[in-house]
Amino acid sequence: MDSSAVITQISKEEARGPLRGKGDQKSAVSQKPRSRGILHSLFCCVCRDDGEPLPAHSGAPLLVEENGAIPKHTPVQYLLPEAKAQDSDKICVVIDLDETLVHSSFKPVNNADFIIPVEIDGVVHQVYVLKRPHVDEFLQRMGELFECVLFTASLAKYADPVADLLDKWGAFRARLFRESCVFHRGNYVKDLSRLGRDLRRVLILDNSPASYVFHPDNAVPVASWFDNMSDTELHDLLPFFEQLSRVDDVYSVLRQPRPGS
């Protein structure tokens, strides 16, 4: 495996552009993913460069092949088991990892919160991980309010040990990695209809619009985070999530016009 295929993340430059996904893999002249070094391989959700966003859909899981075709007679197999008793009445919140909760780098960082060894093709690389400000209080409270699911387009060999260290409270009831994404038109998309939950009671928190292009009405967008230790985004979002935790249908809130939209 090329070491550039383990972590899915976006750069600061991509974060400033319109609808840029994590680790854009699409070339104007080729459908093949282009190599972008170690980070792209470990950390990778990509964005569409062509056309309008896909419409939201609901119902049975949409299993999309790489060529965009929907296979016929595909048996329904959901990504999540049935909710535990303590979560049966809670909304399910899908939470992204890279640039949402943490930022990771292969370059040494003096103030890294975690250093994760990742083996790629027989070589161990050190991944330096910074925690986003307020992530601890955020995860603790979210775990109390919701059925939380970590869903990342990065590979488990990197993301799983990060989650072990990050989630001190067991907020994440499940963890989903790149193999659970739908690879569609050059993008890793998180298809919420495959979770096995009522979409009226599903939220996704992600810094990449490409990740939730199938279900934009379920999204709570969050700004990409890299290293600004004065960032308050997660802290500022908690009151909104407190409100959402009490509704019967998330669309009753998320489909309303939002300030600045």
Curated annotation (Swiss-Prot):
Binds 1 Mg(2+) ion per monomer. GO terms for molecular function: metal ion binding; RNA polymerase II CTD heptapeptide repeat phosphatase activity. The keyword Magnesium applies. Its EC number is 3.1.3.16. The modification N-acetylmethionine is found at M1. Monomer. Interacts with REST. This is Carboxy-terminal domain RNA polymerase II polypeptide A small phosphatase 1. It comes from Mus musculus. The gene is Ctdsp1.
